[in-house]
Amino acid sequence: MKIGIIGAMEQEVAILKAAISDITEVNKGGCTFFSGQLNGVDVVLLQSGIGKVAAAVGTSILLSEYQPDVVLNTGSAGGFDSTLNLGDVVISTEVRHHDADVTAFGYEIGQMAGQPAAFKADDKLMAVAEQALAQMEDKHAVRGLICTGDAFVCTAERQEFIRKHFPSVVAVEMEASAIAQACHQFQVPFVVVRAISDVADKESPMSFEEFLPLAAQSSSEMVIKMVALLK
């Protein structure tokens, strides 16, 4: 078993990087790959950079050159579900682009030409995420649709657009749909496990900066437990 783990920012991968033994570092395509062992399992940790293009580039290199059996996407997200608070966890059931629109050609809003409308997370990986969550005392989690776009969602207008077109959305962020699409095209199972750094309708940019470390801690803890369960 080899596990690919993807985070966008240095802050989102730092805890995981510190937990990897016999680590080696490779820089390629503007991305950084850390290989080694985590809980006795072979892992490749990708720090992709922010946004969908950076994530797609990094994930494609990860999948083609390192050939992981599964991919876990970690990091922070903005909460849309009313029950979510800072530091809570979201587990993807599916992932969609919220900033794609080729409806003029008969596709659904958020669906790219030639691609499914939604990228479904792997059932087994979702179950492992649930098992990991059960090991985390008093940690609240929501399962559902995660939406991705190349924008930090902090305006009422954009929030309203996303809620209108994706009413079941539980969280938004800036990389997961690109990662999911790459995994779909390479036929590699994936799941997204992120923690909430800011909540819609609140002071999102301010809370993001303040609570990113909390989100990184929560999501990294989940991933470490998942890796142990996948051993």
From Swiss-Prot:
Active site (record annotation): E12 (proton acceptor), D198 (proton donor)
MF-aspect GO terms: adenosylhomocysteine nucleosidase activity; methylthioadenosine nucleosidase activity
Matches recorded under InterPro entries: MTA_SAH_Nsdase, Nucleoside_phosphorylase_d, Nucleoside_phosphorylase_sf
EC number(s) given by UniProt: 3.2.2.9
Keyword Protein biosynthesis on entry: no
Organism superkingdom: Bacteria
Annotated catalysed reactions: S-adenosyl-L-homocysteine + H2O = S-(5-deoxy-D-ribos-5-yl)-L-homocysteine + adenine; S-methyl-5'-thioadenosine + H2O = 5-(methylsulfanyl)-D-ribose + adenine; 5'-deoxyadenosine + H2O = 5-deoxy-D-ribose + adenine
UniProt keyword list: Amino-acid biosynthesis, Hydrolase, Methionine biosynthesis
Pathway the protein acts in: Amino-acid biosynthesis; L-methionine biosynthesis via salvage pathway; S-methyl-5-thio-alpha-D-ribose 1-phosphate from S-methyl-5'-thioadenosine (hydrolase route): step 1/2
Residues the entry annotates as binding substrate: G78, V153, M174, E175
GO biological process, one term: L-methionine salvage from S-adenosylmethionine
One of the record's GO cellular component terms: cytosol
Purpose: Catalyzes the irreversible cleavage of the glycosidic bond in both 5'-methylthioadenosine (MTA) and S-adenosylhomocysteine (SAH/AdoHcy) to adenine and the corresponding thioribose, 5'-methylthioribose and S-ribosylhomocysteine, respectively. Also cleaves 5'-deoxyadenosine, a toxic by-product of radical S-adenosylmethionine (SAM) enzymes, into 5-deoxyribose and adenine.
Family: Belongs to the PNP/UDP phosphorylase family. MtnN subfamily.
Protein name in UniProt: 5'-methylthioadenosine/S-adenosylhomocysteine nucleosidase
Gene that encodes the chain: mtnN
